[in-house]
A protein has these predicted regions:
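Boundary/linker segments flanking structured domains
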Residues: 1-318
Length: 318
């Protein structure tokens, strides 16, 4: 069994902001000022979910309600479901307009547009229980960095010309004709986790060394801060290791590794672990998953920076 230090530290990179959109909408992201210098967009996920459309031939309207029928495509199978809404428009003279491929629709009356929506975001605006919306969940295909620290503020706009994103996005569309391909832009914030072992009998030398080390590591993590680019690097690597996306190659089997200079500060500080945490059910109203990770509203995983033979996990019960 590996050793444990009297005081152990871990860095938890917690999902702070996430925006989902399609590639053609990247040009509009900066208009919303959703990402800023305090919560910049450094990482992006390329994801897929079933293709969602509306059946314009099954639209119904009465004084009491409007009925819309949506279609979920799963490979070569098509499932329909109906949603009814109270008619608050004080008229039955409402038309549904949707051109092929029926992923966008309008509700109009006398030339006035009442609703103008893309099907997927429209359905995503409803509580999950209301529409049984597991078809809105996102399968992670690729994870990458938007840009380095210097380009953080303009990253969403500059992603329009990001060659790696464009190439993988296009390949995903070709390989998944029954699916919609979505981008999830993400910002992560650091949470420092500290554990002090009051049960293990340490030697005086170990305790003295810990008294010297503890404030240095604490100050570095909480005040001076780890290099921002290194945080982006190990967050990306940890997410790739966790989700094992189809289109990622590096980090799948090689994280963590002390030979990687791109996050060497973690080893210099001799911290115990790095963690990733994503709570997407409330933020974007869907779950994330991959071939190796099941659907869940919340994902958290820790990665020990050393083998268990060298170092005991701070998350194990003492």
């Amino acid at each position: 069994m590996g050793k444990r230090l009297p005081t152990e530290f871990a860095i938890n990179m917690n999902l702070e902001k996430m925006m989902i959109l399609q590639q053609s909408e990247l040009q509009f992201v900066n208009q919303f000022n959703y990402f800023d210098e305090y919560n910049p967009c450094h990482l992006y996920f390329i994801c897929k979910r079933p293709r969602l459309t509306i059946n314009p031939n099954k639209f119904q309207v009465t004084n009491e309600y409007l009925s819309l029928t949506f279609v979920v495509q799963k490979k070569n199978e098509f499932e329909e479901f109906e949603l009814k809404f109270e008619n608050n428009f004080s008229t039955e003279d409402i038309q549904l307009v949707s051109d092929y491929p029926h992923n966008i629709f309008k509700l109009t009356t006398n030339g006035e547009t009442l609703v103008d929506a893309k099907v997927s975001p429209f359905l995503q605006s409803f509580p999950r229980y209301y529409i049984n919306g597991d078809f809105l969940d996102l399968e992670v295909l690729y994870i990458g960095q938007s840009f380095g620290v210097e380009g953080a503020r303009t990253a969403p706009d500059r992603l329009k010309n990001h060659s790696t994103l464009q190439g993988i996005y296009s390949e995903a569309i070709i390989n998944n004709p029954d699916s919609e391909i979505w981008l999830a832009l993400a910002s992560f914030n650091q949470i420092t986790i500290t554990m002090m072992d009051g049960k293990t009998k340490f030697t005086k030398k170990e305790l003295d060394e810990d008294d010297e080390r503890r404030p240095k590591v604490f100050d570095k993590l909480n005040w001076e801060g780890i290099n921002e680019q290194q945080k982006i690097n190990f967050t990306e690597a940890a997410l790739i290791k966790y989700f094992q996306p189809k289109y990622n190659i590096i980090y799948k089997d090689s994280f963590p590794n002390p030979a990687h200079k791109t996050y060497s500060e973690c080893y210099d500080l001799d911290i115990n672990a790095v963690c990733i945490e994503l709570q997407t059910s409330e933020m974007i109203n869907c779950y994330m998953y991959s071939d190796v990770v099941e659907k869940a509203p919340w994902h958290m995983h820790e990665f020990l920076l050393n083998s268990t033979e060298e170092r005991k996990s701070m998350f194990e019960i003492i």
